Amino acid sequence: MLAMLVMLAESSGAQTSQQWRDSVSTLNELIRQNPKDTDLRLRKAEGNINLQQWDYAIEEYGHVLRQDEKNLAALYFRAYCHTQLRHYDMAKADYDTFLTIQPQHFEAHLGLAHVLQKMGRKAEILDELNLIVQLFPDSADAYAARAAYETEQKLYDVALYDWDEAIRRHPENVEYAVSKAEILLALERKKEARETLDAAVERGTPRGLLKEWYDRCK
């Protein structure tokens, strides 16, 4: 089932809008003939998502879940569709159910954290981001997700720590270095910001890409 999640995610954008519409039309006819075929419904929902037909996708995932309440693909992507429609309570419910079944799914945890942020639940989102770091201590993205939220909340000291941890795990990611430099510039710590940029250049980032931030260090 998790392989299906990867397959669906990777196939996004592989077809044109017209091809997706043709696929959905064909699948509608197949579903009419085989209404209990969950694979057909998942494939149609994928087409609906790629056409941004969120309500239709949610309807298909509902059919799937009525037959298989623990279908991970349906839960995960229905949560995504609910998020697109700003149905945050329903998105949260689907992510919670998904994570009860598959508690160590990185993208689902990030999806839940995003929903909690949209709902304005500051304490819960920080708890979720802390959990993500605990579950995935080797993931640069885990630290970066927490750092981004801390930066937004102006929790600069802890954000700097998390950006450092993200950089340590993925030193080639220039966005992490720039994010750290942005905080240092906001704190008027220009020398440290420049050192952060210099370190990124030493790791292989072309200096020209960082000109905007170097100029602000003067």
Task: State the predicted function of each range.
Residues 33, 67, 101, 135, ...:
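Structural marker of alpha-solenoid helical repeat scaffolds
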Residues 1-7:
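Bacterial N-terminal signal peptides
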Residues 38-39, 72-73, 106-107, 140-141, ...:
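Helix-start (N-cap) detector for alpha-helical repeat units in TPR-like alpha-solenoids
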Residues 17-26, 52-63, 84-97, 119-131, ...:
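Structural signature of tandem alpha-helical TPR/SEL1-like repeats
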Residues 8-55, 59:
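N-terminal leader/linker segments that initiate helical-solenoid repeat arrays
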Residues 18-23, 182, 186-218:
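Terminal, low-structured helical/coil segments at or just beyond the last alpha-helical repeat
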Residues 49, 76-83, 117, 144, ...:
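Position-specific recognition of the canonical hydrophobic site in helix A of tetratricopeptide repeat
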